[in-house]
Regions:
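Anion-binding (especially nucleotide phosphate/pyrophosphate-binding) glycine-rich loop
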Residues: 2-166
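FAD-binding subdomain of flavoenzyme oxidoreductases
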Residues: 154-159, 166-200
Length: 200
């Protein structure tokens, strides 16, 4: 077993995105909960995968936090590493990969559709996909629903009022008003405990 060194996580995500004893009450919708021993904010799938791989190697407990919706945290906090997906660099006007939204409209060329669907290994869906939306795990469902509606697309309205992130919604198959994530998802990237990224 290796010894946990916070410097390794700082090398992966940057020193400014690692905090010690961060109050989790600031990151949950109920505004309760003690501090996380370490609070880390990756902004790409690669950074998240590298963090998970390292934490598994040193056998440090970790938890992925999206929007913190309906999450209860004990007053004692969390004696491990919280990997938060809720980071957005507003000062620089940049959006990290985990918060990006890409919409390929229905009038996109067949070549564009094939290229995008091949990226996710689902080229066989080309005949059934009218429009394509790709979004990171940290994207708020309300934001995604609004962006999709702004493009004149339908089918994701059910998620507009769900107070969570896309990553959490996929994990638990969130739904409302007769719609569910399983009804609209074509493919997903998943990071396993060894830090490998898979397409499903």
């Amino acid at each position: 077993m290796h010894i946990f060194e916070i410097d390794r996580l700082e090398q992966i995500v940057g020193k400014d995105r690692v905090r010690e004893e961060e109050p989790l009450a600031k990151h949950t919708t109920f505004r309760i909960g003690g501090p996380a021993k370490w609070f880390v904010e990756p902004d790409s799938a690669e950074q998240l995968a590298a963090c998970i791989k390292y934490l598994e190697e040193v056998q440090m407990q970790w938890y992925i936090l999206g929007n913190g919706s309906n999450l209860l945290v004990a007053d004692e906090g969390y004696d491990g590493v919280i990997l938060s997906l809720h980071r957005m660099n507003k000062e620089a006007g940049q959006v990290g990969e985990l918060h990006q939204i890409r919409i390929l409209p229905a009038d996109a060329s067949e070549t564009e559709k094939v290229a995008v669907l091949e990226e996710y290994g689902v080229k066989q869906c080309i005949s059934t996909v009218k429009a394509y939306v790709s979004a990171g795990a940290g994207v708020m469902l309300s934001t995604l629903a609004a962006r999709i509606a702004d493009q004149g697309l339908a089918g994701f309205e059910f998620a507009g009022g769900i107070p969570g992130t896309l990553g959490g919604a996929v994990t638990m198959n969130a739904g409302a008003y007769g719609g569910e994530i399983k009804d609209v998802i074509v493919a997903a990237k998943m990071i396993d405990r060894t830090g490998k990224i898979h397409l499903f």
